From Swiss-Prot:
Belongs to the CobT family. Catalyzes the synthesis of alpha-ribazole-5'-phosphate from nicotinate mononucleotide (NAMN) and 5,6-dimethylbenzimidazole (DMB). Pathway: Nucleoside biosynthesis; alpha-ribazole biosynthesis; alpha-ribazole from 5,6-dimethylbenzimidazole: step 1/2. The gene is cobT. This is Nicotinate-nucleotide--dimethylbenzimidazole phosphoribosyltransferase. It catalyses: 5,6-dimethylbenzimidazole + nicotinate beta-D-ribonucleotide = alpha-ribazole 5'-phosphate + nicotinate + H(+). The active site is at E316. GO terms for molecular function: nicotinate-nucleotide-dimethylbenzimidazole phosphoribosyltransferase activity. HAMAP family: CobT. Its EC number is 2.4.2.21. It comes from Xanthomonas campestris pv. campestris (strain ATCC 33913 / DSM 3586 / NCPPB 528 / LMG 568 / P 25). It comes from the Bacteria.
Length: 348
């Protein structure tokens, strides 16, 4: 399978439904704009769904797990074995995102792309194995061209499955010790930022640990200074799960499925996806502003205003999942409120 599919046209929201939904908002029993961004969200979902009565009930959450060679540089508080252990935890339903998915009635897909501490076959885990880990970005490219192709395809496969269920919202998450370092390096390359501005606490590093992380990123950027395109930067500085997120975001936009983006690492993947296929941006919402240092710069680059700011930095799609009740509320108000005419209430 080639990767030419990532350049394919994205779906276009329905302008007629958008206009009709805006007109309805103006007639609901409230002052114009009184429900603020909730009004905008409802209209956005109506246009996405081509339905003047939008809902956000069928949700597909995919968490991509993969290990990183850069973990050998001591950039995390946790050992690399944790990635595989967390895959088991996802499968057993004990992780934060598993709890949130149950609470939301969402479908949770866990995808094992390659972990050092391999848990093997597990129920409710899709095995899309590429390698035990991507390479150390301080020494060589994270992925070969074939590995990048397979990682992108693994993300697209999530969307292919989600489409068969009539999914109304896709949420992507990640798990991988060392992946905040890879995401920060990738973000530096895409935004021409200094590592000190993008390196954050990740799993809980102190100031000394963050400074070391920035030094590691500086080394990686020097090794890959000749990476000239977004795709090549992803191949050299990213990782399997970051590339899978990129593939999922592009495929979702092509399929007309809205995406709720999670935190720092997921937003770095979203930025790559938009660089590769600008039509993706129309289908992205951003769940929250992470506590991770570099997230604000990524959001600015994407002209994104996240729904929540709760000082989260867990990943796993958890922050995005927490924002889903807001989307449901927006649609419920849009669909359920009476118009002035229906209620017999005088308009202004």
């Amino acid at each position: 399978m080639s990767i030419e599919w990532i350049q394919g046209a994205c779906a276009v929201p329905d302008a007629r439904v958008q206009a009709a939904s805006l007109a309805r908002q103006e007639q609901l029993t409230k002052p114009p704009g009184a429900l603020g961004r909730l009004e905008q969200l409802a209209v956005q979902f109506a246009a996405w769904q081509r339905n003047e009565q939008p809902t956000v009930q069928r949700i597909w959450i995919a968490v991509y797990a993969a290990d990183h060679g850069v973990a050998a540089e001591g950039v995390s508080m946790f050992p690399q074995a944790v990635t595989g252990e967390m895959v088991r935890n996802f499968a057993r339903g004990g992780a934060a995102i598993a709890v949130l998915a149950r609470e939301l009635g969402a479908r949770l897909e866990v995808v094992n792309l390659g972990v050092v501490n391999d848990p093997g076959e597990l129920p409710r885990v899709r095995r899309a194995w590429i390698a035990p880990a991507c390479a150390n970005i301080c020494e060589q490219a994270a992925m070969t061209p074939a590995q990048l192709r397979d990682a992108l395809a693994a993300g697209a496969e999530s969307i292919a499955q989600a489409r068969t269920c009539g999914t109304q919202l896709f949420v992507g998450g990640e798990m991988g010790i060392g992946n905040s370092t890879a995401a920060a390096a990738l973000s530096c390359a895409l935004l021409s930022q200094f590592p000190q501005a993008m390196a954050g606490a990740g799993t809980g590093l102190d100031a000394e640990g963050i400074a070391h992380k920035a030094t590691v990123i500086t080394r990686a950027l020097a090794v890959h200074a000749d990476a000239a395109t977004p795709l090549e930067r992803l191949r050299r500085l990213g990782g399997f799960e970051i590339a899978a997120l990129v593939g999922a975001y592009i495929a979702a936009a092509q399929a007309g499925i809205p995406v709720l983006v999670d935190g720092f690492i997921s937003t770095a993947a979203a930025l790559v996806a938009v660089h590769l296929n600008p039509g993706v941006r129309e289908w992205l919402l951003f769940g929250h502003r992470s506590q991770e240092r570099g997230h604000a710069a990524l959001l600015r680059a994407l002209e994104a205003e996240p729904l929540l700011q709760l000082d989260l930095r867990l990943g796993e799609a958890s922050g995005a999942a927490v924002a889903i009740p807001l989307l449901r509320t927006a649609c419920a108000l849009h669909n359920g409120m009476a118009t002035f005419a229906e209620a017999g209430v005088s308009d202004a």
